[in-house]
Amino acid sequence: MRTLWNHFSTISYIKISPRMRRISAANLISNRNLSTISSTEDPELRDFVGFLESLKNYEKSGVPKGAGTDSDDGFDLGRMKRLMLRLRNPHYKYKVVHVAGTKGKGSTSAFLSNILRAGGYSVGCYSSPHILSIKERISCNGEPVSASTLNDLFYSVKPILEQSIQEENGSLSHFEILTGIAFSLFEKENVDIAVIEAGLGGARDATNVIESSNLAASVITTIGEEHMAALGGSLESIAEAKSGIIKHGRPVVLGGPFLPHIEGILRSKAASVSSSVILASNIGSSSSIKGIINKNGIGLCQSCDIVIQNEKDDQPIVELSDVNLRMLGHHQLQNAVTATCVSLCLRDQGCGRVTDEAIRIGLENTRLLGRSQFLTPKEAETLLLPGATVLLDGAHTKESARALKEMIKKDFPEKRLVFVVAMASDKDHVSFAKELLSGLKPEAVILTEADIGGGKIRSTESSVLKESWIKAADELGSRSMEASENKTVLGSLKLAYKILSDDTTSSDSGMVIVTGSLHIVSSVLASLQH
């Protein structure tokens, strides 16, 4: 194996193995200053975004060790409670569903929000990160908050925010201030219920100021190996941190499936605060994917039967046939089942308008940017990729890579594949690569870079990613792979397209898969706007 280095870009030539064809290390030098905030943000929000950017942003810099644990190293939840008190505790004015979990939070929250909306309820949803605009993080009734509404609220509470920052000696963070604004906006918009997604862990997350009195239910979707250092270094400590959102006397819906001892940790916490447990992966185990259909005006969907059974006698509580989910994969079916279980929990609490039909409509109308998202033919053509099939999926952990791999194997078993990958520096690059390479045989893997949280601090250099993928291939028995030059995310897409197009011996046009981070997805979607 020999590697040649150009002063401005990475050009690696590595011999090809029989099982793999190419890995391309793309050094994104000419696009390294791409920032989601600066390139795609609404110009009306300049003051608001500038205010937030003046604060400590852990999405950009990385989270300190142990910061998400319920320990002396954890974030100080007291300062968030004091901020909420200064804002007159807006989060006490409506019911809340609090959602935590390693993977599946965003999809589950979106499914649930749409189910409630289909039932006629006014719904607020707070999530992170955003893809194109910070407005996406705070939505009311299915739409991101408008710039004018956000500005009006910001200017009205700005003196309180400034006073709070001063009294907390500048320690309030970007996420804490934004969380306070979200809670305030939901009060202003008079929502019936808010679906609140935890940012990191649970116990010490800024969202964990919700009290039992207005908590409708807690939800823990999955437990996996992400943010390990910030959450204590083990699956057990991660489960402990996320179980911190379980509140006294309020039900908790567990997504899963979980390892038995991890489920035990969550159940133990629930028992200690007299919280009833609904295990979605158990009572929804009869749910299944029937096949993939191409629905006019919508695109690819997976047709599913969703069956939720009574835990005591296995009799169906909900039985929905041919539900067309717009996000693909068994993991998305599980997220839909989890959201359905939460909606049934709310129905039992008096939300009678959450009918079976509302559940169906809500599930079928849910789509999220960067989650099993296929570009339309027009979007592909806009990126100068005419006729290409392009899948955007923000998978960035071993577990989400496995889910992506299984979806591709099941739904597109004969497709020729090229991956375009960029990742954050705090992810397990080798494990991610091994998951994708262990069950798939891509024509090429093109490695590039994308800004993380609007900055470069947490972005992984493509040359580092290249070494991780080579190591993964070596551990799987593929000795070496060929690499070629590229500089930008868009250039990487064009190279992927060229690799697939140049093979005239195949009638299959292939598929380009953009993955490794929601931030590389953001780069692609931002390009469509320009």
UniProtKB/Swiss-Prot annotation:
Keywords: ATP-binding, Ligase, Magnesium, Metal-binding, Mitochondrion, Nucleotide-binding, One-carbon metabolism, Transit peptide. It holds the Pfam family Mur_ligase_M. Mg(2+) 2 binds at H227. Pathway: Cofactor biosynthesis; tetrahydrofolate biosynthesis; 7,8-dihydrofolate from folate: step 1/1. It catalyses: 7,8-dihydropteroate + L-glutamate + ATP = 7,8-dihydrofolate + ADP + phosphate + H(+). Its EC number is 6.3.2.12. Residues 1-33 form a transit peptide. Its main location: mitochondrion. PROSITE patterns: FOLYLPOLYGLU_SYNT_1, FOLYLPOLYGLU_SYNT_2. GO terms for biological process: embryo development ending in seed dormancy; one-carbon metabolic process; tetrahydrofolate biosynthetic process. InterPro entries: Folylpolyglutamate_synth, Folylpolyglutamate_synth_CS, Mur-like_cat_sf, Mur_ligase_C, Mur_ligase_C_dom_sf, Mur_ligase_cen. Transmembrane segments: none annotated. Disruption phenotype: Defective embryos with development arrested after the globular stage, at the transition to the heart stage. It is found in: Mitochondrion matrix. It is an enzyme of class 6 (ligase). Mg(2+) 1 binds at S128, E197. PANTHER family: DIHYDROFOLATE SYNTHETASE-RELATED, FOLYLPOLYGLUTAMATE SYNTHASE-RELATED. Conversion of folates to polyglutamate derivatives, including tetrahydrofolate. Required during embryogenesis; from maternal tissues until the globular stage, and from the embryo after the globular stage. Belongs to the folylpolyglutamate synthase family. This is Dihydrofolate synthetase.
